[in-house]
């Protein structure tokens, strides 16, 4: 990437070391960071989406265990109570649960809990960065193959929500192949779904792509199908918050509709994920993956800057109209062309996933 961007980092400039994170709620209008120094602050940051994106949530959770270890002064039994609070902060992204469980497993036999918690969190974070790079390489090979098949020099990719470096350390998942394509000199244009109601595409993905100098166009969520009908989308790449053993994919609400449109128009639909996003305990994702329901205010209100450049939050609905706000949907495996993972590309079915990830 052009810049040395990070969604989170350890900050030891203060009296006690803390986790510093970009406050993603304020982007793209204001770049600001938050210092997380307590378990409560970590949980709140995850819940209120100061940080978001499956991978980054997992990384914050891992460092949250380190912060909690300092709070309880190395007492493992007390740490288990803090870990549970972090683990339950959001229900859909499996990376969160995986990171907490992995940290607690690694620390169960530790004689130096605080020091080891710091080391293990850094190791998990670094491992995720390497996985992101592998996804970039495998995904870019698909981009190159599609260009070759279509005898084109320019590719149009549609993505939904945000699955770049703000969401997954270090280059993301869905955006990682796009960043790699740019490094290889490929002419890339990205259709960016706005991704209502929180507008992660319009606010975050567009901001990332702007920083990287990648050509992109923000579109209304309902426009993707028309673009596919007109042949203006060569492929779709999205990330995921949880993938079941049979290949069903939970991702930001609206992903399922894009997959249906892609399937109907013969557009390949790819999901980019690290190993930690798989939930092998769930056999049928459509029926079993828990779906987070968030506040209806996210639908009723929208945030932006006015003509004077002032950041405002305004209501766009009748005051007394009810709302429904599920944060995710599940795309059945049959609609997915392939999964782009850190271990290579595989079809979204039980046998291929098991062979690649469980031996």
From Swiss-Prot:
It is an enzyme of class 5 (isomerase). It holds the Pfam family IF-2B. It catalyses: 5-(methylsulfanyl)-alpha-D-ribose 1-phosphate = 5-(methylsulfanyl)-D-ribulose 1-phosphate. Pathway: Amino-acid biosynthesis; L-methionine biosynthesis via salvage pathway; L-methionine from S-methyl-5-thio-alpha-D-ribose 1-phosphate: step 1/6. GO terms for molecular function: S-methyl-5-thioribose-1-phosphate isomerase activity. Substrate binds at residues 52-54, 90, 200, 251-252. SUPFAM superfamilies: NagB/RpiA/CoA transferase-like (SSF100950). InterPro entries: IF-2B-related (IPR000649), IF-M1Pi (IPR005251), IF_2B-like_C (IPR042529), Initiation_fac_2B_a/b/d (IPR011559), M1Pi_N (IPR027363), NagB/RpiA_transferase-like (IPR037171). Keywords: Amino-acid biosynthesis, Isomerase, Methionine biosynthesis. The record marks 161 as: Transition state stabilizer. The active site is at 241 (proton donor). Its EC number is 5.3.1.23. One of its GO terms (biological process) is L-methionine salvage from methylthioadenosine. The keyword Amino-acid biosynthesis applies. Belongs to the eIF-2B alpha/beta/delta subunits family. MtnA subfamily. Catalyzes the interconversion of methylthioribose-1-phosphate (MTR-1-P) into methylthioribulose-1-phosphate (MTRu-1-P). HAMAP family: Salvage_MtnA. This is Methylthioribose-1-phosphate isomerase. The gene is mtnA.
């Amino acid at each position: 990437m052009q810049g040395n961007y990070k969604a989170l980092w350890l900050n030891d400039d203060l009296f006690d070391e803390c986790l510093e994170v970009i406050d993603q709620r304020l982007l793209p209008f204001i770049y600001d960071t938050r210092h997380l120094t307590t378990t409560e602050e970590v949980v709140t940051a995850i819940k209120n989406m100061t940080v978001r994106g499956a991978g980054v949530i997992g990384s914050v959770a891992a460092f949250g265990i380190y912060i909690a270890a300092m709070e309880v002064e190395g007492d493992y039994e007390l740490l288990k109570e803090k870990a549970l609070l972090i683990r339950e902060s959001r229900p859909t992204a499996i990376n969160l649960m995986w990171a907490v469980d992995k940290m607690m497993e690694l620390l169960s036999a530790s004689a130096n809990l605080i020091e080891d918690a710091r080391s293990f969190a850094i190791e998990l974070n670094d491992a995720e960065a390497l996985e992101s790079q592998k996804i970039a390489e495998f995904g870019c090979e698909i981009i190159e193959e599609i260009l070759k098949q279509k005898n084109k020099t320019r590719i149009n990719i549609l993505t939904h929500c945000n699955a770049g470096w703000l969401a997954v350390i270090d280059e993301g998942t869905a955006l990682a192949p796009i960043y790699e394509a740019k490094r290889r000199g490929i002419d890339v244009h990205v259709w960016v779904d706005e991704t209502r109601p929180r507008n992660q595409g319009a606010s975050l993905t567009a901001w990332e792509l702007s920083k990287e100098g990648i050509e992109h166009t923000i579109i209304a969520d309902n426009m993707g199908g028309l673009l596919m009908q007109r042949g203006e989308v060569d492929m779709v790449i999205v990330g995921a918050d949880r993938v079941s053993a049979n290949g069903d994919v939970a991702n930001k609400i609206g992903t399922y509709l894009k997959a249906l449109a892609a399937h109907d128009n013969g557009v390949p639909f790819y999901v980019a994920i690290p190993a930690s996003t798989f939930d092998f305990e769930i056999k049928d994702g459509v029926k079993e993956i828990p779906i987070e329901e968030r506040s209806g205010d996210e639908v009723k209100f929208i945030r932006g800057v006015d003509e004077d450049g002032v950041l405002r939050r305004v209501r766009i609905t009748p005051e007394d109209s009810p709302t429904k706000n599920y944060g995710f949907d599940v795309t059945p495996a049959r609609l997915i062309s392939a999964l782009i993972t850190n271990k290579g590309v595989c079809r979204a079915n039980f046998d291929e996933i098991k062979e690649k990830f469980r031996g």
